Design a protein with these regions (language model features):
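Short, well-formed alpha-helical segments that are part of the catalytic scaffolds
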Residues: 11-25
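Acceptor/aglycone-binding surface of glycosyltransferases and processive sugar-polymer synthases
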Residues: 58-75, 80, 92-168, 194-217, ...
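Cell-envelope/extracellular polymer assembly enzymes that use nucleotide-activated donors
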Residues: 2-4, 173
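Catalytic donor-sugar/metal-binding loop of nucleotide-sugar-dependent glycosyltransferases
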Residues: 143, 165-166, 176-193
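Short hydrophobic beta-strand elements that form part
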Residues: 4-8, 55
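A conserved acidic beta->alpha catalytic loop
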Residues: 35-43, 88
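Acidic helix N-cap motif at the loop->helix transition within catalytic regions
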Residues: 14-18, 40-48
Length: 226
């Protein structure tokens, strides 16, 4: 199978070398970095290291970055595409488990979950994650314990959906929508690290705004999307 890792990156100059080193040492999968118009040295480092990189002309955000990566995967006929953060919090050693779940026909989307066998911490972000979890369960009947995880593997049909339908995004509301459409999803326990360098773009204010928009979409938009 042809497998592609999509690495969205925005101002990850201090992390991207370590991320690609982790990927190449722990897998034999192809990768593409989607540089979201970073204003640090991310682009320069990628070019100097001769990494496979796509650079957006303006900052468009995570959704557009992943969608571009999916279009790349679709155009180049990949069988599985993996979403893998560029901030160093994900560990590539878990990716073969996600791939195997798809290869074995257990699911069409495999999620690297922090909470299959572990409880969530009582932080604002995790409270928000729990609210999203409950909304997904309310609208679909299925429990996704880590709906905001950014480590996911998608099969060929899901790649096509991303590449040809702009309403399909790497967000929890799309997960809820796809569940209702009969897409099989499996969560696999993984560990994630704390960010070592740089700052997360997700401030408390942005996190609250994000949570509200996702909850609204799950309950009132994706619920009725055909």
């Amino acid at each position: 199978m042809k497998i592609l890792i999509i690495v969205p990156a925005y101002n990850e100059a201090l992390n991207i070398v370590g991320v690609i080193k982790d990927i190449t040492e722990n897998t034999d999968y192809d990768y593409v970095i989607v540089n979201d118009a970073s204003n640090d040295e991310t682009k320069k480092i990628c070019e100097e290291k001769k990494y496979n990189v796509l650079t957006l002309p303006i900052n468009l955000g995570l959704t557009s970055g992943i969608q571009l990566g999916m279009k790349y995967a679709y155009k180049n006929n990949y069988d599985i595409a993996i979403q893998f953060d560029g901030d160093g919090q994900h560990e590539a050693k878990y990716l073969p488990q996600l791939v195997k779940a798809i290869e074995d026909g257990e699911c069409e989307i495999a999620i690297g979950s922090r909470f299959v066998n572990k409880n969530k911490h009582h932080t604002i972000r995790m409270i928000g994650s729990n609210m999203i979890l409950r909304c997904i369960k309310f609208t679909t009947g299925k429990t996704i314990k880590d709906p905001t995880s950014g480590m996911r593997a998608y099969d060929k049909e899901i790649i096509k959906k991303f590449a040809t339908n702009s309403s399909i995004t790497p967000e929890p509301d799309t997960i809820a929508y796809l569940i209702k459409k009969g897409v099989k999803i499996k969560e696999i326990q993984v560990e994630m690290k704390e960010r070592k360098h740089g700052k997360s773009y997700l401030t408390i204010g942005k996190a609250m705004k994000y949570m509200i928009s996702i909850l609204f979409s799950i309950l009132f938009v994706k619920k009725f999307q055909k």
